[in-house]
Regions:
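Recognition helix of helix-turn-helix/homeodomain-like DNA-binding domains
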Residues: 25-38
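Key DNA-contact positions within bacterial/archaeal DNA-binding proteins
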Residues: 17, 28, 57
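DNA major-groove recognition helix of helix-turn-helix/homeodomain DNA-binding modules
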Residues: 43-58
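Short basic helix-loop element that most often maps to the first helix and adjoining turn
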Residues: 3-22
């Protein structure tokens, strides 16, 4: 799933480890989400969105969801 995490993280001068610590996950999970290898769970997506002060749909691109189902 496409997302803006890398862009938002860099705008906020956060490393992958910084964001992982903030949202309670691992750096590897953040890396996998950023490159599209892993889709964040709803609770994790919510924590990421809340940290950046955005809605989930402002970070994650759901247009491909219908094709994946």
């Amino acid at each position: 799933m496409k997302n803006r995490i890398n862009e938002l993280r860099k705008e906020n001068k956060l490393s992958q480890m910084d964001l992982a610590d903030i949202v309670g996950t691992t750096r590897q999970t953040i890396t996998s989400i950023e490159v599209g290898k892993y889709t964040a769970s709803l609770p994790l997506a919510y924590k990421i969105a809340r940290h950046f002060g955005l809605k989930i749909e402002d970070i994650f691109d759901f247009t491909d969801i219908d094709e994946e189902v």
